[in-house]
Amino acid sequence: MQKQRLLNVGFGNFVVAERVVSIVNPASAPMRRLREEARDQGRLVDATQGRKTRSIIVTDSNHVILSAIQAETIGQRFIQEENS
């Protein structure tokens, strides 16, 4: 059985690293539309614990995960997971 690596997206929430397609900044209009479409279709996971959304993670299953951690920070964690 293959060991799955987990990516910490903040506040005790984790995502399977192999399923991540992109980690993006939520400020642009296309990302806001992506978030609203995911919410309408039931594909949105809010992992912000009530805090401001600072990054959006898109998975290969087309789920959209909101995180209160900066996209750059999650990207660095992702790279560290890849190297370990």
From Swiss-Prot:
InterPro entries for this protein: RemA-like
Pfam families: RemA-like (PF04025)
Family: Belongs to the RemA family.
Matches recorded under NCBIfam families: PRK04323.1
Annotated protein name in UniProt: Putative regulatory protein Dde_2720
Species of origin: Oleidesulfovibrio alaskensis (strain ATCC BAA-1058 / DSM 17464 / G20)
Native organism taxonomy: Bacteria, Pseudomonadati, Thermodesulfobacteriota, Desulfovibrionia, Desulfovibrionales
